């Protein structure tokens, strides 16, 4: 996803999740590889993936700083931990989404996908509600 993605008008959690899952579907093989090798691959691959995710995490941290509801978080490390958490959650969401596409067909798939989007949105909302009260 590009930085332009974050500048969409009327962006909300559900729209963000839909865009995210569309990106996952377009690049499912890459997601599967990254997820499988991030924890289960050779040390060389695990280290390479860790190096590759650091700039993503740092970039997300910068994006989070721009969000009005994050302005009260002054500790840079706290924002970085939040970015890491979101990156980790994205790997879980991606693999679960890919698994849905493999397990279900037709209208069952659409129904399961909608339920999963709602679940992911609730997870994000709960996370950000907690952050709103972070001191």
Regions found by a protein language model. Name each.
Residues 1-29, 79-86:
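Hydrophobic alpha-helical connector segments
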Residues 7, 66-74, 135:
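Surface-exposed helix-capping loop/turn segments at secondary-structure junctions
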Residues 69-74, 100-114:
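Short helix-coil transition/hinge motifs at the ends and kinks of transmembrane helices
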């Amino acid at each position: 996803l590009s930085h332009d993605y974050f500048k969409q008008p009327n962006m909300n959690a559900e729209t963000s999740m839909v865009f995210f899952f569309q990106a996952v579907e377009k690049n499912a093989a890459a997601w599967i590889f990254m997820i499988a090798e991030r924890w289960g691959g050779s040390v060389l691959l695990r280290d390479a993936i860790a190096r590759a995710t650091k700039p993503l995490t740092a970039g997300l941290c910068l994006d989070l700083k721009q969000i009005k509801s994050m302005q009260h978080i002054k500790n840079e490390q706290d924002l970085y931990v939040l970015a890491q958490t979101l990156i980790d959650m994205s790997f879980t969401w991606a693999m679960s989404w890919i698994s849905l596409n493999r397990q279900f067909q037709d209208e069952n798939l659409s129904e399961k996908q909608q339920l999963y989007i709602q679940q992911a949105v609730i997870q994000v909302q709960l996370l950000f509600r907690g952050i709103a009260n972070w001191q």
